[in-house]
Amino acid sequence: MFYDDNADLSIIQRRKVGVIGYGSQGYAHSLSLRDSGVQVRVGLPEGSKSRPKAFEQGLDVDTPAEVAKWADVIMLLVPDTAQADVFENDIEPNLQPGDALFFGHGLNIHFELVKPSGDVTVAMVAPKGPGYLVRRQFVDGKGVPCLIAVNQDPTGTGEALALSYAKAIGGTRAGVIKTTFKDETETDLFGEQAVLCGGTEELVKAGFDVMVEAGYPPEMAYFEVLHELKLIVDLMYEGGIARMNYSVSDTAEFGGYLSGPRVIDADTKERMRGILRDIQDGSFVKKLVANVEGGNKQLEVLRKENAEHPIEVTGKKLRDLMSWVDRQSTETA
């Protein structure tokens, strides 16, 4: 683990950093780098809706190509599916020997969708939290833990540069963990698919379906399997599974011990291993690339199917009754 004393902020302060993208992570990185005394410019296309926001926050903004030409450290923070095109069209033609190309996620490097030349440092600085939290913690004098990795290091200074960058966005205040592009990519994808997004979503929908099919009102089913999920996740987030079990009733704890393994059993774990194998051997990324090359048609079909599930209809109706819910961030249609 690395902390403030292990990182030299002056290293990144002597460089010119171009942040390509101004989404959740892009704005947090850009503003925190600037506030740490780093020269920073934001790369956004001419028609980007994020341009006014970046200008309003006092940042220098130019096209991705111009920023890549100016910078000697480029942090690529556009979505995974757009990175290869941005690299090919805007970044690669402007890379110089000795430049550094940074990523917030390892997918495109690990699966060789982006292939920088050997005279460019390739590294990753990945905060383990959303951009708003990275920025809020930085402003409060704290930080969000970060992962760093170096995939290509022609000058032998990649780790020091990555640590310096992490310090500039507050990461070393909380702690920085050294990893590899392979481990970060594969664990991140597996967590998303098997547990956080895919697994949880299907578990919730299945629970809803079982209750409704058994004759219970859909509103009751929604409250029990989706709405109350936040209460449980918050407890686990704050103190682990033990904290959650300590905080719920004895009835809930005892029932969970008995019934949980009936839902998630050895067969489930074997299917999860299959998901991990598909990630490790590149099968998933091939499907991802094929979807993008096909105009996202498969993704749009899946989104439509998901949006039409009865739990979404019920949920929208119930959330209309919840004045405390931020509807702007929760409603997608």
UniProtKB/Swiss-Prot annotation:
Cofactor note: Binds 2 magnesium ions per subunit.
Positions that bind Mg(2+) 1: 188, 192
All residue ranges annotated as the KARI N-terminal Rossmann domain in the record: 1-179
Keywords: Amino-acid biosynthesis, Branched-chain amino acid biosynthesis, Magnesium, Metal-binding, NADP, Oxidoreductase
UniProt-annotated binding residues for NADP(+): 22-25, 48, 50, 80-83, 131
Pfam families in UniProt: KARI_C (PF01450), KARI_N (PF07991)
Domain KARI C-terminal knotted: 180-325
GO CC terms: cytosol
Catalysed reaction, written as an equation: (2R)-2,3-dihydroxy-3-methylbutanoate + NADP(+) = (2S)-2-acetolactate + NADPH + H(+); (2R,3R)-2,3-dihydroxy-3-methylpentanoate + NADP(+) = (S)-2-ethyl-2-hydroxy-3-oxobutanoate + NADPH + H(+)
The keyword Magnesium appears for this protein: yes
Binding site for substrate: 249
GO molecular function: ketol-acid reductoisomerase activity; magnesium ion binding; NADP binding
Active site: 105
Sites where the protein binds Mg(2+) 2: 188, 224, 228
UniProt record, GO biological process: isoleucine biosynthetic process; L-valine biosynthetic process
Pathway: Amino-acid biosynthesis; L-isoleucine biosynthesis; L-isoleucine from 2-oxobutanoate: step 2/4; Amino-acid biosynthesis; L-valine biosynthesis; L-valine from pyruvate: step 2/4
Enzyme class: oxidoreductase
Cofactors: Mg(2+)
Its EC number(s): 1.1.1.86
Purpose: Involved in the biosynthesis of branched-chain amino acids (BCAA). Catalyzes an alkyl-migration followed by a ketol-acid reduction of (S)-2-acetolactate (S2AL) to yield (R)-2,3-dihydroxy-isovalerate. In the isomerase reaction, S2AL is rearranged via a Mg-dependent methyl migration to produce 3-hydroxy-3-methyl-2-ketobutyrate (HMKB). In the reductase reaction, this 2-ketoacid undergoes a metal-dependent reduction by NADPH to yield (R)-2,3-dihydroxy-isovalerate.
NCBIfam families in the cross-refs: ilvC, PRK05479.1
PANTHER family, per database record: KETOL-ACID REDUCTOISOMERASE, MITOCHONDRIAL (PTHR21371:SF1)
Similarity-based family: Belongs to the ketol-acid reductoisomerase family.
Protein name: Ketol-acid reductoisomerase (NADP(+))
Gene designation per UniProt: ilvC
